[in-house]
Amino acid sequence: MGTGWSLLCYGPAALRPAPVQAAVQARLDALVAELSHWGSDSLLCRFNALAAGEGLDLPPDFAAVIDVALQVAAASGGAFDPCMGALVQRWGFGPPGQPDARARAPLQAWRELHWDAPRRHLRQPGGLMLDFSAIAKGHAVDCISALLVELGLPHHLVEIGGELRGQGLKPEGQPWWVDVEPPAPDCDLPALRIALHQLAVASSGDYRRFRIDEQGRRLSHTLDPRTGRPVAHGLALVSVLHESAMWADAWSTALMVLGPGQGLALAESRGLAARLVLREAGGWRQLLSPALRALLEDEA
């Protein structure tokens, strides 16, 4: 997935870290073998290479990701799209290498996918390139959290590429308190400090990956699937809290694409706990959804 991972967990005194680390790495390797768009031998890349009309019967992880991705795509009016691989490459934000000459980058590409959820069968309409970079890390966080519970380690904090999930409590009875990273060193807004107790947080923004074009304009790596271009509003960072890191991951991207007005409206209508940070001429401003305000009040 092109990123690193870390975890903190508490267990019995006899716990040996090495077997836990090995089990976590094996689970992550299996996910990468299915969901990664880095390289050419993953299941995702094999789907991208299928001819029109061909399909795959998907294993559970891949099926779970595409199912949630298409739900968020529909609920957001196409602001989230798992079929942006070709578009991302054309803007220079994808993996290194030459893009597939057969790849297409139609707007609202997700609508062309043929997904049979009961059969877990996905059919390639021809030339579409899946890219799960806005959802796969969240799913991996959920999977590792579930694995740790299976290993008898229900008290843990998992982080993959900046997406986090906390489960259980620390030994002193406190939840896992985390501070969400600010969008820039000069951001003077108070830190978003939250307790991750059976809760995940994921963020999307232009503060890490962007480039400057020939006119000196800042181009966000977040692309709008509805226009095929980088988003051009003032949002610098969106953070979403959810029981599932996968859902938080996808929703944060959708809200980032929609912008402050439509993004906050969607968060309110879906009951999402979201923080939207805007970069403005006079400094920084934040918008908090009602669900996040209620959550922060409960923690105060």
Model features per residue range: what roles?
Residues M1-A300:
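Mature catalytic core of soluble alpha/beta enzymes
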